[in-house]
């Protein structure tokens, strides 16, 4: 669907933009060459090369955008292998083991307090899970939106004045691709933090630590987009 939108809806618009840019380039070149009085053969050759490059970029727009995300996917896949091998933890297993070892030593009052804390933390975790899901699906939708309009900014790359539009668009694409890497790093840090809970001797501390680390993870995921754009200077 995204490719059909890009090729059937946006490419005709991009074709009009390229036509307007090439006409503007021709008029500018003629004016710079004293109204055709100082025009040589290299003038037409340079103009023809620029037009061919612009059309070729437009025809390969979808392939170029997908190649950028293929590179990003390769980076994320390699990062996932490194992170999963060095920082893997099962939160449920860790907390269950702590509960089984400490519940028998607690009184009624402590159990009631622990039950209330558990319900509060469980509610917070569900809210954080929803927010994390929003971040991940929001990034996926943003990628689809970026790809669907790719021909329009690519059509401006051949012009010196309008080329900044296409350059910023490509930077934004690279930022989206590298955002996945930052997300994996955040998850790896979260796993390392949660792994430290295994040595905690207090259930109350463990519960609130998991909640705090999940809040940190959620906040970090929200910041990955702006961080990726700032690293690549995308606007």
Give the residues covered by each predicted segment:
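Non-cytosolic segments of integral membrane proteins
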Residues: 51-149, 183-232
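Transmembrane helix-bundle signature of multi-pass membrane transporters/permeases
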Residues: 169-177, 215, 219
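Juxtamembrane "helix exit" motif at the C-terminal ends of alpha-helical transmembrane segments
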Residues: 15, 19-31, 183-198
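Hydrophobic alpha-helical membrane segments
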Residues: 176-184
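Binding/recognition "hotspot" determinant
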Residues: 1-17
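Hydrophobic transmembrane alpha-helix segments characteristic of membrane transport
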Residues: 17-55, 149-163
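Alpha-helical transmembrane segments
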Residues: 154-171, 199, 230-231
């Amino acid at each position: 669907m995204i490719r059909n939108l890009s090729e059937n809806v946006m490419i005709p618009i991009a074709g009009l933009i390229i036509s307007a840019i090439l006409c503007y380039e021709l008029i500018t070149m003629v004016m710079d060459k004293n109204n055709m009085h100082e025009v040589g053969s290299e003038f037409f050759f340079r103009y023809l090369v620029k037009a061919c490059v612009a059309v070729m970029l437009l025809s390969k727009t979808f392939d170029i955008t997908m190649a950028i995300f293929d590179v990003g996917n390769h980076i994320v896949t390699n990062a996932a292998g490194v992170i999963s091998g060095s920082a893997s933890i099962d939160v449920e297993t860790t907390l269950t083991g702590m509960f089984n070892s400490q519940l028998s030593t607690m009184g009624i009052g402590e159990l009631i307090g622990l039950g209330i804390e558990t319900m509060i933390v469980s509610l917070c975790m569900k809210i954080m899970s929803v927010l994390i899901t929003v971040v991940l699906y929001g990034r996926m939708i943003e990628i689809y939106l970026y790809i669907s309009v790719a021909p329009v900014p690519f059509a401006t790359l051949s012009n010196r004045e309008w080329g900044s539009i296409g350059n910023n668009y490509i930077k934004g694409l690279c930022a989206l691709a590298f955002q996945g890497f930052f997300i994996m790093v955040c998850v790896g840090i979260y796993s390392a933090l949660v792994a430290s809970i295994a040595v905690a001797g207090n259930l109350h501390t463990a519960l609130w630590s998991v909640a705090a680390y999940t809040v940190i993870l959620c906040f970090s995921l929200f910041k990955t987009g702006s961080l990726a754009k700032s690293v690549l200077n995308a606007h």
